[in-house]
């Protein structure tokens, strides 16, 4: 209700919270809370945790048991509860950036990741939304999951997927990430310009003497295999 003070404030987490969904996951007659971890500040795209809060007579308490399957699950951009299998308990579907859509089945005491069972393990993408419905009117739950659109500077295919490396590249305590793209020779090249890299990683300018040289350097030639293996 507009103007009302919050009835409860949840303790802050390391990750940035994203999508929030409600369902009676423990079937006790009240709504429990799923909070999606969107990202970890200054550590993109390191996988983030998501959390389950159980409603106990109007007070939401984080449940380590229910939250366990969502530790380090990824950059969760959207979530929806739905009754997917034959029982009456709400299951959970997630859309994750730099990952796959994920399906978690409710057992009554926790969630089990059944993404592979539903054939979604190979559908990697920059997923940003998910919803459910009986779209073909056959009595079964269908999914609609949205990915990054074609009106983007990014493109990918099964043969040439998008690849990103991330980690503390030079042990300075700063989390780095490197976007790449496949060249005509099927080798990986840095996607960002030399100027972008120089701003984020000034030491990288020692690796090339001209923009022309940089434009022809593969990822391994620019960073070296030992650096890439760290990420």
Model-assigned labels for residue ranges:
Residues 1-231:
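Beta-propeller-forming repeat regions
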């Amino acid at each position: 209700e507009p103007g009302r003070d919050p009835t409860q404030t949840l303790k802050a987490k390391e990750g940035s919270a994203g999508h929030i969904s409600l369902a009676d996951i423990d079937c006790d007659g009240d709504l429990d809370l799923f909070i999606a971890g969107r990202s970890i500040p200054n550590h993109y795209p390191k996988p983030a945790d998501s959390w389950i809060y159980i409603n106990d007579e109007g007070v939401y308490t984080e449940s380590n048991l229910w939250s366990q399957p969502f530790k380090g699950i990824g950059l969760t951009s959207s979530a929806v509860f739905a009754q997917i299998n034959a029982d009456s308990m709400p299951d959970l579907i997630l859309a994750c950036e730099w990952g796959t859509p994920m399906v978690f089945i409710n057992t009554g005491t926790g969630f089990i990741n059944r993404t592979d069972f539903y054939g979604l393990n190979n559908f990697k993408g920059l997923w940003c939304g998910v919803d459910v419905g009986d779209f073909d009117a056959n009595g079964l739950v269908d999914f609609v999951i949205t990915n990054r659109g074609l009106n983007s500077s990014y493109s990918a295919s099964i043969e040439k997927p998008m690849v990103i490396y991330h980690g503390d590249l030079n042990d300075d305590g700063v989390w780095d990430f490197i976007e790449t793209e496949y060249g005509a020779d099927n080798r990986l090249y840095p996607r960002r310009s030399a100027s972008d890299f120089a701003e984020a990683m000034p030491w990288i300018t020692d690796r090339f003497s001209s923009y022309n040289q940089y434009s022809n350097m593969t990822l391994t030639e620019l960073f070296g295999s030992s650096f890439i293996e760290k990420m």
